C-alpha cells in the first residue's frame, strides 16, 4: 500500500462528524483572519475555500435528483408495495409537525413581541406569491413537469411523480431490466457515499465564506428577531419533535432526535439546502436500518413538504411586521395564521427564496401593504446566514426523525 493509499484509508476511518467539526473550526479561523487582515495569500486561500464549498454543495445538488429518481424507481419496480400505510403515516406526521411548528412560531411571537426597523431597508426585488392558491398551483404544475427538466432543475415533486409512475409501469418488465436499475441504484449510492466523505472540505469552505462575507456586525441590529427565531426553532427540534416521537412510540425520543440533529442537521446547517441534504438523509436512514421502501420516498417528499422551520419563520416574521405597524391580532386571526403558515411552508420549496418570499402571503392576513412586507423579506435575507441555516437544519433533520417514527410504527422489527 502506497503512502497516498494509507492516507486515504486513514481519512476514511476517522469519524465523519469529528472531521466536519474540524473543518468548521478551521473555516471560521480562516474567515476571521481574512476579514481582519486580508492580504494576497489569505484572500487567495479564502477564494480557494469558497470554491471547495461551492463544489461540495454543487455536487450534492447534482447527484440528489438522479439518486432520488433511481432509488424510488428501482424500489417500486423490484419490491412489494407493502408499506402504503407507512407513507400515509409519514405524510400525517409531516402535516401535524408543520402545523405545530407554526403554532410555536405564533406563541413565541406573543410571548416575545418583536418589532423591526424597516425604514432604511431596501425592499427585496423578487416577486412573492399573491395568495395560497398560487403556491398550491405551482406545486401541482411541478408534479406534471417534463421528467428530464424535473431532474435537471431539481424539481423533486416532479421527480417523485415520474419515478413512481415509471416504477409502477416497469413492475412487470423482465428480471434483466430490473437488475439494470438495481445496479444503477447501487452505483449512485456509492457516488453519494464518496461525496459525503468530502463533506469536511465543503463545510470548511462554506464556513470560511460565510464568516468572511457576513461577520457579526451586520446581524447585530437584528439580534432580537434572530434570537426569537432560533429559540423557537430549537423548541420545535428539542420539545415538539421529541413529544411527537414519545406519544407515537412510547419510548425515550432523544437518542433518535440527537442522532438526526448531529448527522443530518449539522450538514444541512451549512449547505442551507434540503435538496442538497437528501443524500445525507438517505445515508443516515440506511445507517439506522429503516425501511428502504419507506425512506426512499419519504425523504425526498419531506424535502418538499416537511417545512417545520419555514412555518416558524413565516409566522414570526409576519407577526413582527404586524407588531411594527401597531397591529394586534386576536386569537382567531392568530390561529388562521398558523394554518396559512403551515400550508405556505409546505410550498416553500416550490418558491425561489423559500420561506422568506411567503412572508407577504402571511402579512396579507393583516392587510399589510406589499411594499412593507417586502422590506420584511429583505430583513430576512440579511439575517439569512443564521435564519436559513437553522431553518434548513430543522427541516432536514425532522425528515429523518419522522421517517424513523413511521418505520418503527409500521414495522416494529426495524
Curated annotation (Swiss-Prot):
One of its GO terms (biological process) is threonine transport. The keyword Nucleus does not apply. It catalyses: L-serine(in) + Na(+)(in) = L-serine(out) + Na(+)(out); L-threonine(in) + Na(+)(in) = L-threonine(out) + Na(+)(out). Its main location: membrane. Keywords: Amino-acid transport, Cell inner membrane, Cell membrane, Membrane, Symport, Transmembrane, Transmembrane helix, Transport. Gene3D superfamilies: Sodium:dicarboxylate symporter. GO terms for molecular function: neutral L-amino acid:sodium symporter activity. SUPFAM superfamilies: Proton glutamate symport protein. Belongs to the dicarboxylate/amino acid:cation symporter (DAACS) (TC 2.A.23) family. PANTHER family: PROTON/GLUTAMATE-ASPARTATE SYMPORTER, SERINE_THREONINE TRANSPORTER SSTT. Involved in the import of serine and threonine into the cell, with the concomitant import of sodium (symport system). This is Serine/threonine transporter SstT. It comes from Campylobacter hominis (strain ATCC BAA-381 / DSM 21671 / CCUG 45161 / LMG 19568 / NCTC 13146 / CH001A). The gene is sstT.
Amino acid at each position: 500500500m502506497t503512502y497516498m493509499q494509507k492516507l486515504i484509508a486513514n481519512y476514511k476511518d476517522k469519524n465523519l462528524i469529528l472531521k466536519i467539526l474540524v473543518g468548521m473550526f478551521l473555516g471560521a479561523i480562516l474567515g476571521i483572519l481574512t476579514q481582519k487582515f486580508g492580504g494576497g495569500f489569505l484572500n487567495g486561500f479564502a477564494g480557494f475555500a469558497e470554491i471547495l464549498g461551492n463544489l461540495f454543495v454543487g455536487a450534492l445538488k447534482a447527484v440528489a435528483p438522479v439518486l432520488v429518481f433511481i432509488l424510488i424507481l428501482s424500489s417500486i419496480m423490484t419490491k412489494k408495495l407493502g408499506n402504503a400505510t407507512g407513507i400515509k403515516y409519514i405524510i400525517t406526521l409531516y402535516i401535524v409537525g408543520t402545523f405545530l411548528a407554526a403554532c410555536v412560531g405564533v406563541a413565541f411571537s406573543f410571548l416575545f413581541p418583536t418589532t423591526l426597523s424597516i425604514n432604511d431597508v431596501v425592499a427585496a426585488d423578487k416577486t412573492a406569491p399573491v395568495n395560497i392558491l398560487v403556491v398550491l398551483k405551482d406545486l401541482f404544475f411541478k408534479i406534471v413537469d417534463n421528467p428530464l427538466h424535473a431532474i435537471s432543475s431539481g424539481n423533486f415533486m416532479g421527480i417523485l411523480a415520474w419515478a413512481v409512475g415509471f416504477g409502477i409501469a416497469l413492475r412487470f418488465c423482465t428480471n434483466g431490466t430490473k437488475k439494470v436499475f438495481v445496479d444503477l441504484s447501487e452505483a449512485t449510492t456509492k457516488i453519494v457515499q464518496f461525496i459525503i466523505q468530502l463533506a469536511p472540505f465543503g463545510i470548511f469552505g462554506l464556513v470560511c465564506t460565510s464568516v468572511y462575507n457576513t461577520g457579526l456586525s451586520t446581524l447585530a441590529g437584528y439580534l432580537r428577531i434572530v434570537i426569537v427565531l432560533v429559540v423557537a426553532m430549537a423548541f420545535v427540534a428539542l420539545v415538539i419533535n421529541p413529544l411527537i416521537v414519545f406519544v407515537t412510540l412510547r419510548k425515550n425520543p432523544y437518542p433518535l432526535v440527537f442522532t438526526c440533529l448531529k448527522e443530518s442537521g449539522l450538514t444541512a446547517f451549512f449547505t442551507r439546502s434540503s435538496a442538497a441534504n437528501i443524500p445525507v438523509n438517505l445515508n443516515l436512514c440506511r445507517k439506522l436500518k429503516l425501511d428502504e421502501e419507506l425512506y426512499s420516498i419519504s425523504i425526498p417528499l419531506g424535502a418538499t413538504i416537511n417545512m417545520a422551520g419555514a412555518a416558524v419563520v413565516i409566522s414570526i416574521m409576519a407577526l413582527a411586521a404586524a407588531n411594527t405597524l401597531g397591529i394586534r391580532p386576536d386569537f382567531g386571526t392568530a390561529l388562521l395564521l398558523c394554518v396559512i403558515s403551515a400550508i405556505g411552508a409546505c410550498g416553500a420549496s416550490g418558491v425561489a427564496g423559500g420561506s422568506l418570499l411567503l412572508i407577504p402571503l402571511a402579512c396579507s392576513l393583516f392587510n399589510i401593504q406589499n411594499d412593507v412586507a417586502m422590506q420584511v423579506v429583505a430583513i430576512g435575507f440579511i439575517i439569512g446566514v443564521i435564519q436559513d441555516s437553522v431553518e434548513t437544519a430543522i427541516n432536514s433533520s425532522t425528515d429523518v426523525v419522522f421517517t424513523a417514527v413511521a418505520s418503527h410504527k409500521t414495522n416494529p422489527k426495524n
